[in-house]
């Protein structure tokens, strides 16, 4: 997904649209390109400060616009492919989990999701529906947001956090497999065999 908007629009200005998108938890991850005839440094900085990913001044070369679009989408795809796998060696590196967090609101969202999972990690009944309820979001909105930021479905993300905690506990060597399974919400120790 990508939004391209002129700043001078009849219903809502493009910079207002950008600000609304970037301040909404459901849309803050979507890249925004602003097109405008406003070409002074103050306007450009203002557009970038509200969260625009690109600010292109008119008149512009359509090839440059296409290249910017391609670069934004390619970079997001590269990040998804790089961080989409379950890397068990970086259990303490939470920044890698949010591949598409360009706004503070996105980092806070991921931190809140992670906190809710970690607070309930020993509960085998922690499901996507329970997590959605804890986050105060509909299942669809939650799925779309988490998938866009982490390239993980919510169920897979819960499992990822549980597995990372399990790996950490296994490395400590102070608990049995059965204890670790219980401590991380797995109903059966067979997940570790």
Q: Where does each model-flagged region fall?
A:
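Active-site beta3 strand of CheY-like receiver
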Residues: 1-4
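Receiver (REC) domain active-site loop signature in two-component systems and cognate sites
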Residues: 9
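C-terminal output helix
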Residues: 60-69, 73, 81
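Terminal helix-turn-helix DNA-binding modules in bacterial transcription factors
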Residues: 148-187
């Amino acid at each position: 997904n990508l939004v391209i908007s002129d700043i001078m629009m009849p219903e809502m200005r493009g910079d207002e649209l950008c600000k609304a998108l970037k301040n909404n938890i459901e849309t803050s991850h979507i890249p925004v390109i602003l097109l405008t005839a406003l070409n002074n440094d103050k306007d450009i900085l203002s557009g970038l400060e509200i969260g625009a990913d690109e600010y292109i001044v008119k008149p512009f070369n359509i090839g440059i616009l296409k290249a910017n679009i391609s670069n934004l989408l390619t970079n997001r795809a590269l990040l998804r492919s790089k961080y989409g796998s379950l890397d068990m060696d970086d259990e303490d590196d939470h920044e890698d989990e949010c591949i598409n967090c360009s706004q503070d609101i996105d980092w806070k969202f991921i931190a809140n999701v992670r906190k809710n999972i970690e607070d309930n990690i020993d509960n085998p009944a922690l499901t996507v529906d329970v997590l959605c309820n804890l986050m105060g979001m509909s299942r669809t909105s939650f799925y779309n947001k988490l998938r866009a930021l982490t390239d993980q479905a919510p169920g897979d993300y819960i499992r990822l956090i549980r597995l990372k905690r399990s790996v950490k506990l296994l490395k400590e060597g102070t608990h049995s497999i059965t204890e670790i399974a219980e401590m991380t919400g797995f109903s059966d120790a067979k997940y570790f065999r």
